């Protein structure tokens, strides 16, 4: 049984404040792709790739991640941009690349950025949506976001989601890594603490080898002198 979405208090973010047209002339404001403005095959291709950049991220736009069936339906206008975004987010490739390596809290953060164009309001919202993932599954969570009133008011049926009212000092959402620090730890990537410990042990090993080399050199020198001394005594007889 799916649990209802817990209540949370939205905080003030840029996309909730009227811009008075200032954001429209800001060079960092993203170009808004709308299906009704795509009147040529090249313009539809640009819209499709904008959707891939938004959902899959800049670093994950690879040929084998393409969803040709969804692209064809969109080009034929048999589905809306909203349906195309939904299909990309629920595709097997997206699940393997993004969903599998992450926990529910990071999935909520990434999904709000990629599908709703904003960051989470607070930890309460992240907890509320993470419960939806646990109770409805990934597909149900995606449907809940895309069918939400916020998505409808922000993008409607035929607008590609975008980062709403980004400041020049903000990192673009399209460059957000697909996995967090916990995945890097599980993947076995060496952390700084472990690297320093390894360096310390390595330095200790190098010191031991150096000392052993010096002792061997001294021993060899003493042996050589002993042999020379013995040969000198033997020749005197």
From Swiss-Prot:
Ranges where the PBS-linker domain occurs: 11-191
Membrane topology reported for the UniProt record: Single-pass membrane protein
Protein localization: Cellular thylakoid membrane
Gene3D superfamilies with a match to the protein in the record: Phycobilisome linker domain
Spans traversing the lipid bilayer: 208-228
GO terms (BP aspect): photosynthesis
Keyword annotations from UniProtKB, A to Z: Antenna complex, Membrane, Photosynthesis, Phycobilisome, Thylakoid, Transmembrane, Transmembrane helix
The keyword DNA repair is annotated on this UniProt entry: no
InterPro entries given in the database record: PBS_linker_dom, PBS_linker_sf, Phycobilisome
GO cellular component labels: phycobilisome; plasma membrane-derived thylakoid membrane
Disulfide cross-links: none
Task of the protein: Rod linker protein, associated with phycocyanin (PC). Linker polypeptides determine the state of aggregation and the location of the disk-shaped phycobiliprotein units within the phycobilisome (PBS) and modulate their spectroscopic properties in order to mediate a directed and optimal energy transfer. Forms a supercomplex with tetrameric photosystem I (PSI) and PC that allows efficient energy transfer from PC to PSI. This protein seems to be in the middle of the PC hexameric rod and may anchor the PC rods at the periphery of PSI tetramers.
Oligomeric and partner information: Part of a specialized phycobilisome (PBS), a structure that is usually composed of two distinct substructures: a core complex and a number of rods radiating from the core. This protein is part of a core-less PBS rod (called CpcL-PBS). In vegetative cells associated substoichiometrically with photosystem I and phycobiliproteins phycocyanin as well as phycoerythrocyanin in the thylakoid membrane, not found in conventional, hemidiscoidal phycobilisomes.
Family per record: Belongs to the phycobilisome linker protein family.
Protein name: Photosystem I-associated linker protein CpcL
Organism for this UniProt entry: Nostoc sp. (strain PCC 7120 / SAG 25.82 / UTEX 2576)
Gene responsible for this protein: cpcL
């Amino acid at each position: 049984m799916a649990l209802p979405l817990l209540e949370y208090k939205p905080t003030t973010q840029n996309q909730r404040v009227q811009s008075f047209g200032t954001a429209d002339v800001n060079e960092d404001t993203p170009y808004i792709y709308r299906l009704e403005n795509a009147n040529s095959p090249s313009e539809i291709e640009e819209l499709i790739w904008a959707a891939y950049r938004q959902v899959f991220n800049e670093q994950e736009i690879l040929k084998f991640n393409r969803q040709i069936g969804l692209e064809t339906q969109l080009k034929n206008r048999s589905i809306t941009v909203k349906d195309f975004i939904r299909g990309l987010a629920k595709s097997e490739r997206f699940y393997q690349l993004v969903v599998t390596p992450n926990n529910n809290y990071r999935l909520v953060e990434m999904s709000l950025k990629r599908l709703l164009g904003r960051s989470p309001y607070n930890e309460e919202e992240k907890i509320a949506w993470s419960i939806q993932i646990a109770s409805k599954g990934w597909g149900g969570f995606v449907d809940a976001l895309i069918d939400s009133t916020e998505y409808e008011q922000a993008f409607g049926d035929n607008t590609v989601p975008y980062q709403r009212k980004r400041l020049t000092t903000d990192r673009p959402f399209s460059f957000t890594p697909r996995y967090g620090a916990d995945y890097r730890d599980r993947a076995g990537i060496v952390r700084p603490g472990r690297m320093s410990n390894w360096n310390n042990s390595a330095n200790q090993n190098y010191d031991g080898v150096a000392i052993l080399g010096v002792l061997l050199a001294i021993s060899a020198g003493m042996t050589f002198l002993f042999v020379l001394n013995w040969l000198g005594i033997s020749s005197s007889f």
